[in-house]
C-alpha cells in the first residue's frame, strides 16, 4: 500500500490566527512588566498607608520658593515659582509630629512642602493659590481632626491627605495583560488543534478510499 501523505501546511487564515495569538501573548507579557514598573510599585506603596486621625499643629511658609513647569500651548512650556508652605500635624497612629502632603505624587515631587499649586505662568497666581490653601488649613480646619494616611515603614515623618491609588489600579495592572495573554494562548492552541483535527480527518478519509 502506498504511504499516505497529508499536508500539514497552514492556510493563510490559520497563519494569521497564530500570528495574532503570538502577538497577544507577547503584548500581555510586556504590558505586565510595563504596568508593574509604572503603576504597581507606587500603587502598592500608596495602599500600604493606614488611615489615621490627624490634627494641625502649625501652618507656615518657610521662606523658600520652588520651580514648577507650566504649559501654555502645544509647543509652549516654561517655569515659574511658588512659595513653600508646611503643615505639620499630630498623627494619632504614632502620636508624633509629621509633615502633611496632599498625595503620594506631591510627596515624591517635593518632599519639603505640603502643597504644590497648579502651575501658572505668573508667580503671583501661584502665590495666591498657596495662600488660599494655607488660609484654608488655618481658618477652616484649625484644630479639627481629619483623616490622613500614614506609612510607618516607608516614611514615618510624612502623612498623606489622600490616596492617589486604590485596589482598582491593581486590578487593571493584572487583569488586561492576563486577558491578552490568555486570549493569545487560546487562539494559538485552538488553531493548532483545529488544524490537527482537520489533518487527521483528511488522513482517515484517504485511508477509507484508498
Curated annotation (Swiss-Prot):
Could you tell me the superkingdom of the organism this chain comes from? Answer: Eukaryota
Where does this one sit in the cell? Membrane
Ion transport among keywords: yes
The protein's recorded glycosylation sites are: 53, 90
Please provide one cellular component term from the Gene Ontology annotations of this protein. Answer: plasma membrane
Instruction: Provide the topology term for how it sits in the membrane.
Output: Multi-pass membrane protein
InterPro entries given for it? K_chnl_Ca-activ_BK_bsu
Q: Which residues lie on this side of the membrane: Extracellular?
A: 41-167
Q: Which GO terms describe its biological process?
A: action potential; detection of calcium ion; neuronal action potential; potassium ion transport
User: What are the protein's GO molecular function terms?
Assistant: calcium-activated potassium channel activity; potassium channel regulator activity; voltage-gated monoatomic ion channel activity involved in regulation of presynaptic membrane potential
Could you describe the post-translational modifications of this protein? Phosphorylated. Phosphorylation modulates its effect on KCNMA1 activation kinetics.
Q: Which residues lie on this side of the membrane: Cytoplasmic?
A: 1-19, 189-210
Q: Which keywords annotate this record?
A: Glycoprotein, Ion channel, Ion transport, Membrane, Phosphoprotein, Transmembrane, Transmembrane helix, Transport
Residues passing through the membrane, by range? 20-40, 168-188
| Classification via Pfam families | CaKB (PF03185)
What's this protein's family per the entry? Belongs to the KCNMB (TC 8.A.14.1) family. KCNMB4 subfamily.
Q: Which PANTHER family match?
A: CALCIUM-ACTIVATED POTASSIUM CHANNEL SUBUNIT BETA (PTHR10258), CALCIUM-ACTIVATED POTASSIUM CHANNEL SUBUNIT BETA-4 (PTHR10258:SF3)
| Subunit composition and interactions | Interacts with KCNMA1 tetramer. There are probably 4 molecules of KCMNB4 per KCNMA1 tetramer. Interacts with FMR1 (via N-terminus).
User: What is known about what this protein does?
Assistant: Regulatory subunit of the calcium activated potassium KCNMA1 (maxiK) channel. Modulates the calcium sensitivity and gating kinetics of KCNMA1, thereby contributing to KCNMA1 channel diversity. Decreases the gating kinetics and calcium sensitivity of the KCNMA1 channel, but with fast deactivation kinetics. May decrease KCNMA1 channel openings at low calcium concentrations but increases channel openings at high calcium concentrations. Makes KCNMA1 channel resistant to 100 nM charybdotoxin (CTX) toxin concentrations.
UniProt comment concerning the protein's domains: Resistance to charybdotoxin (CTX) toxin is mediated by the extracellular domain.
Protein name (Swiss-Prot/TrEMBL): Calcium-activated potassium channel subunit beta-4
Amino acid at each position: 500500500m502506498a504511504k499516505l501523505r497529508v499536508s500539514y501546511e497552514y492556510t493563510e487564515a490559520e497563519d494569521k490566527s497564530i500570528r495574532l495569538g503570538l502577538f497577544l501573548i507577547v503584548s500581555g507579557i510586556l504590558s505586565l512588566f510595563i504596568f508593574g514598573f509604572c503603576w504597581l510599585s507606587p500603587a502598592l506603596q500608596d495602599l500600604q498607608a493606614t488611615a489615621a486621625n490627624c490634627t494641625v499643629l502649625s501652618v507656615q511658609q518657610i521662606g523658600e520658593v520652588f520651580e514648577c513647569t507650566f504649559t501654555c500651548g502645544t509647543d509652549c512650556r516654561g517655569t515659574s515659582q511658588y512659595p513653600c508652605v508646611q503643615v505639620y500635624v499630630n498623627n494619632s497612629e504614632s502620636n508624633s509630629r509629621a509633615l502633611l502632603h496632599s498625595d503620594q505624587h506631591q510627596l515624591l515631587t517635593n518632599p519639603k512642602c505640603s502643597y504644590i499649586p497648579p502651575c501658572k505662568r505668573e508667580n503671583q497666581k501661584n502665590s495666591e493659590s498657596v495662600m488660599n490653601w494655607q488660609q484654608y488649613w488655618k481658618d477652616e480646619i484649625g484644630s479639627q481632626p481629619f483623616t490622613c494616611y500614614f506609612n510607618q515603614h516607608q516614611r514615618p515623618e510624612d502623612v498623606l491627605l489622600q490616596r492617589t491609588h486604590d485596589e482598582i489600579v491593581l486590578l487593571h495592572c493584572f487583569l488586561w495583560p492576563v486577558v491578552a495573554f490568555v486570549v493569545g494562548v487560546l487562539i494559538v492552541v485552538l488553531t493548532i488543534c483545529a488544524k490537527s483535527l482537520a489533518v487527521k480527518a483528511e488522513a482517515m478519509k484517504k485511508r477509507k478510499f484508498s
